[in-house]
């Protein structure tokens, strides 16, 4: 028999009345009624009310015991009177009359009064659920995790990972672990480097993704691979990105097309989202090309809950009387229009605030706008420069109704798309156009294979260098590199990128040619990707994969705005683990063993 408990704090019911039971847990709440003290005892599973009578010799002990101390009690289960039943907890029809108390661990505050004050305040948050600054919460994460909301997020994370693993195994995937200490690779972010003691001056890298290893598994003859993979990237924190470490459902398949990958992911994620959320889940996963996404949504991560669509109205303003846009177009710029439904009667301040916000927050040089009154009359700073024919074309292009308005952004194509996309998001939110009770997915496909880097003044890979280009070797040899598309795809949900993937290049000549266009010599490719080059000489199946982010999936399903809320021991925005004190300095002796010297 377990000496600490016969039941959990979520088990006892009316049919347990008169039983002697033993319970263990944390002293969650305490109510002193003079001759009686009522205690809510909490364990991982729930809460049970305990009753301490003043005729017991441990009455003073429980009276003086601090909240969150750990105790073990033995007592008799009694039914509560009808007027004291607590329907908010599953054990609310009973209470335990305590006959024996043993204190397992008592809370002791720090001797420094300032630190003790901090400890008391964070301890109080467990029962009050009030919020505290992030660094304080993370410093006392072991207490923060006792809060119901935070604990439930971690439980949900565990359940989601278990479900993902189950679904992958059901679909015939093998779970295989790939190395954590590996070589640096050009994934697009900075590597975390680990010095080698046995090889002075050389470094391992923590994997940004198991990219090459999973491709090597396909070359090895494994047909379907997956793992819940830890990945490491030295990136700044964002609301949807944790600094340093994250997890992804990493998978790869042989002899597949892009659509085969899509079908696996769609069926898997639909089941997971439908199971773990009360929100509705749209079964449709539309395919949107990168070019279309940037035009219509101003982003390659479009939120399809937002009904607003951006339109290209460059030709409408070409040779128009509005000289600012006319001049921009003559210099190769574009004009994008963003509809704003039912805003024509808003005061001037409404439009001025949007313009000011776009300038300060989005880097826009400015925004133009036209309002269309309910009688169809066009007004605003731009309207007087346009004839009725051009105004009608704007109405048609933006599909607006009388009483609507239209905002305009003009700049170079990429900048105009970015600004218009952010204005679209702003309007969707402020005009309450976004349905918060649904998940909408989409695939972004046909990404550019290459991009011109203005800083380095050279062509570079737009995304994944190991993907298959449309048209294969022929397009690499015959086309303008900036016109070549890739079999690369992103999965987006409610404006958040959940995963990236690609059909991989499985031909050595294509690999050499693609890297040559990006400025890599054959020797550099052989040196940096030696394992992959060797493998590609020995029969490579067509293969592809994807890696949905586990943290982001949990964040969406937990309905949390910040990804750190679904990570058990997160870093803060500065990439610091304030609980463990990492990163930290190391002893000079250790540095010498690693042939390292810190430059101040």
Swiss-Prot record:
Main subcellular location: cytoplasm
GO cellular component: cytoplasm
SUPFAM superfamilies: Class II aaRS and biotin synthetases (SSF55681), GAD domain-like (SSF55261), Nucleic acid-binding proteins (SSF50249)
Organism of provenance: Wolbachia sp. subsp. Drosophila simulans (strain wRi)
Alphabetized UniProt keyword annotations: Aminoacyl-tRNA synthetase, ATP-binding, Cytoplasm, Ligase, Nucleotide-binding, Protein biosynthesis
Protein family (similarity comment): Belongs to the class-II aminoacyl-tRNA synthetase family. Type 1 subfamily.
Superkingdom: Bacteria
EC number(s) given by UniProt: 6.1.1.23
Residues noted as binding L-aspartate in the record, renumbered to the chain: 187, 233, 463, 504
Region (Aspartate): 211-214
Top-level taxonomy: Bacteria, Pseudomonadati, Pseudomonadota, Alphaproteobacteria, Rickettsiales
Subcellular location: Cytoplasm
UniProt-recorded Gene Ontology molecular function terms: aspartate-tRNA ligase activity; aspartate-tRNA(Asn) ligase activity; ATP binding; nucleic acid binding
Reaction it catalyzes: tRNA(Asx) + L-aspartate + ATP = L-aspartyl-tRNA(Asx) + AMP + diphosphate
Protein name: Aspartate--tRNA(Asp/Asn) ligase
Self-association and partners: Homodimer.
């Amino acid at each position: 028999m377990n000496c600490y408990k016969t039941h959990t704090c979520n088990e006892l019911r009316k049919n347990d009345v008169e039983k002697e039971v033993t319970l263990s847990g944390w002293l969650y709440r305490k109510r002193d009624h003079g001759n009686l003290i009522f205690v809510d005892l909490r364990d991982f599973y729930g809460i049970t009310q305990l009753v301490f009578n003043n005729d017991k010799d441990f009455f003073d002990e429980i009276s003086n015991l601090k909240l969150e101390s750990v105790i073990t009690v033995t007592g008799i289960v009694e039914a509560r009177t009808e007027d004291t039943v607590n329907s908010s907890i599953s054990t609310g029809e009973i209470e335990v009359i305590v006959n024996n108390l043993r204190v397992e661990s008592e809370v002791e505050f720090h001797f420094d009064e300032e630190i003790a004050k901090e400890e008391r305040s964070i301890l109080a948050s467990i029962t009050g659920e009030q919020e505290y600054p992030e660094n304080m919460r993370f410093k006392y994460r072991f207490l923060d995790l006792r809060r119901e909301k935070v604990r439930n997020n971690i439980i949900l994370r565990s359940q989601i990972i278990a479900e993902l693993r189950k679904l992958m195994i059901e679909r015939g995937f093998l779970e295989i672990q790939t190395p954590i200490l590996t070589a640096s690779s050009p994934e697009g972010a900075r590597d975390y480097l680990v010095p080698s003691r046995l090889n002075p001056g050389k470094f391992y890298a923590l994997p940004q993704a198991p990219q090459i290893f999973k491709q090597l598994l396909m070359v090895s003859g494994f047909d379907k691979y997956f793992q819940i993979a830890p990945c490491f990237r030295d990136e700044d924190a964002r609301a949807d990105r944790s600094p340093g470490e994250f997890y992804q459902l990493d998978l790869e398949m042989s002899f597949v097309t892009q659509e085969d990958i899509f079908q696996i992911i769609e069926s898997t994620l639909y089941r997971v989202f439908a199971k773990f959320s009360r929100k509705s889940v749209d079964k449709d996963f539309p395919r949107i090309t990168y070019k279309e996404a940037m035009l219509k949504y101003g982003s390659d991560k479009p939120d399809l809950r937002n009904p607003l669509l951006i339109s290209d109205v460059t030709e409408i303003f070409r040779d128009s009387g509005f000289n600012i846009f006319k001049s921009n177009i003559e210099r190769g710029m574009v004009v994008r229009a963003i509809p704003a439904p039912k805003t024509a009667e808003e005061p001037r301040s409404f439009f001025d605030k949007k313009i000011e916000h776009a300038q300060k927050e989005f880097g826009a040089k400015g925004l133009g706008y036209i309002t269309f009154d309910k009688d169809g009359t066009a007004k605003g700073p731009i309207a007087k420069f346009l004839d009725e024919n051009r105004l009608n074309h704007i109405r048609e292009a933006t599909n607006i109704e009388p009483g609507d308005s239209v905002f305009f952004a003009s700049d170079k194509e990429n900048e105009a798309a970015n600004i218009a996309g952010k204005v679209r998001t702003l309007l969707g939110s402020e005009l309450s156009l976004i349905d918060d009770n649904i998940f909408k997915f989409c695939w972004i496909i046909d990404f550019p294979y290459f991009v011109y880097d203005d800083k380095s003044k050279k062509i570079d890979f737009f995304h994944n260098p190991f993907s298959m280009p449309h048209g294969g070797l022929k397009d690499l040899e015959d086309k303008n590199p900036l016109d070549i598309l890739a079999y690369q795809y992103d999965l987006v949900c409610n404006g958040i990128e959940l995963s990236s993937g690609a059909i991989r290049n499985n031909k050595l000549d294509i690999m050499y040619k693609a890297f040559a266009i990006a400025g890599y010599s054959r020797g550099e490719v052989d040196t940096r990707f030696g394992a992959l080059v060797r493998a590609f000489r020995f029969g490579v199946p067509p293969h592809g994969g994807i890696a949905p982010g586990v943290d982001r999936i949990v964040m969406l399903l937990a309905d949390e705005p910040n990804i750190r809320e679904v990570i058990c021991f997160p870093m803060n925005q500065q990439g610091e683990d304030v609980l463990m004190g990492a990163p930290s300095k190391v002893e000079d002796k250790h540095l010498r063993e690693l042939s390292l010297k810190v430059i101040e």
